[in-house]
Each structure stands twice: as C-alpha cells, then as structure tokens.
Regions:
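Patatin-like phospholipase
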Residues: 1-31, 39-257
Length: 257
C-alpha cells in the first residue's frame, strides 16, 4: 500500500471492498499512509472500524508544531496515538505479518521493518522531510519511505502468489499554493509518482482511485469521505475487470526477481 498522506484513508476503503469480494491478505507491505492503514488492519480491526479511532481528531491533535530546525512538526503525539489505540506494541505481535518501509536518512537506502516497536516504525515511514522531524531508531535517523519506494510491491513479491497493489497517489492536484509546505509536498509527489511506476508493473491487481487529488493533507475531518472514494473506486475496478476480462488478475511472472 502506497503513501498518500490524508488519502491513506482510501486504503481502508479499498481494503473493505476487497474483503467483501473475498480477497484477504496473508501479508501486508506498506509505506507512510499505507503503513498506517496496514497496521490497524493487521492489529485485528475491520477497515471501516478504523475510522472510529480518528473521529473527532484534527491534524494538529496528532502533531506538535516546533521551532523549525529539522522539521516543522514533531510526531510525538502521533506515536502516543498509535500506542493508545493499537493492541500490539511490536510488529511481531500483530495478527498479520506487516512490513513497513522507511528511508534510512543516514545511509541513503531503504529500510524494511518487520519487527520492533510499531509506533516508532510507522512514524518513521510517515516522516516526510521538512514537514516532520526525522525519527531516530537505534542511532539511525529515518524519514518517509516513499522517497525511495512509494509503492512497496517488491518487498513481498517473492513470497506471494498474488499481489494486490493499492496506489492512492496516482494524480496530483493541478493547482497548488506558493508556500514552503505546498512546494515541498508537490516536489515530493513527483518523486513518489516516479518511483511507483516500476512497482505498479509487478502487481497482479492494481487499484488506483483517480478521484483523490482535491483533498488537502490537513482535512482529517473528511476521513470517511476519502474512505468511500477508495471503497467505491475499488468496487468499480473489480466489477469492470470481471466484465471486460472475466478475471481481476493479470498474468505476471517474476521468476528472476
């Protein structure tokens, strides 16, 4: 599951639709918003029930504005939120295997977490540079995994017979504000889109809701609306594939991966 900030709620809607079509994951790979959606599901929650955890919250409830040094916001409140609402505290305690992708800022490489403290690793994967201060884990600083791999299909491709990729960041809004945060986010989105292209081709089923570009990253109050966008788009995609091709799966071979 891809990154996508507030659009990550569409992951939950897509997952809900997939479950209703009897498509259930045995393992989840997520980055940033995808890691957040994935961890709540892997902790035993139905996708539509996850919305309840965020009800009544605003962006500022989960972040802390700081004097800019390495980021405009800290994620301490976000980590506390995760610790308060997840039953599992370590990745290895989850009901379903979850691999979280982050970017190792010190060494310029990908990091794939499958064990350890959940809150720290989800925060690291969601930590978009400039906007958020890097997260330190075991003496290494980490930032948003989407910088190097925004759609982490390769992470689990070898161990899966079928891979469903959900990409909630296929398009960007045509208009943007000329300020430091807006310009930074838009610039990152170019990177996210670019490194997603090769990963898209490795999936057996690709879900891309193309109706999410109008949402602001601070509109947490629209979580349910974004959820429904993902839900409806996924149902439409599955039904169209069945009608046009007779199957939702495409033929993919990765013998040499």
């Amino acid at each position: 599951m891809s990154g996508g900030f507030i659009k990550g709620f569409a992951h939950l809607g897509a997952m809900q639709a997939l479950l209703e079509h009897d498509i259930k994951p045995n393992i989840i790979s997520g980055v940033s918003a995808g890691a957040l959606a994935g961890v709540f599901y892997a902790d035993g929650n139905e996708p539509h029930k996850v919305l309840d955890y965020f009800a009544g919250h605003k962006f500022q409830d989960l972040t802390k504005l700081v004097i800019p040094k390495v980021g405009l916001f800290e994620l301490s409140e976000f980590k506390d939120f995760l610790k308060s609402n997840l039953k599992a505290k370590k990745l290895e305690e989850l009901q379903l295997p979850l691999i979280i992708t982050a970017t190792d800022l010190d060494h310029g490489r990908l990091a794939h977490f499958h064990k350890g403290d959940i809150a720290e690793r989800v925060a690291a994967s969601c930590c978009m540079p400039v906007l958020f201060a890097p997260v330190k884990i075991d003496e290494t600083y980490y930032v948003d995994g989407g910088l190097l791999m925004n759609l982490p299909v390769s992470t689990i491709r070898r161990v899966c017979e079928k891979v469903v990729a959900i990409n909630v960041s296929p398009l960007m809004a045509p208009k943007y504000k000329m300020n430091i945060v807006s310009v930074a986010l838009r610039s990152y989105n170019f990177m996210f889109r670019s490194n997603s292209f090769p990963e898209r081709e490795k999936a057996d089923l690709l879900i891309e809701p193309y109706n999410l570009d109008g949402y602001s990253n601070r509109e947490l109050e629209k979580a349910e609306e974004i959820f429904m966008q993902g839900y409806n788009a996924t149902n439409d995609i599955l039904e169209r594939l069945q009608i046009e091709k007779g199957t939702i799966w495409k033929a993919v071979s990765y013998t040499h991966l």
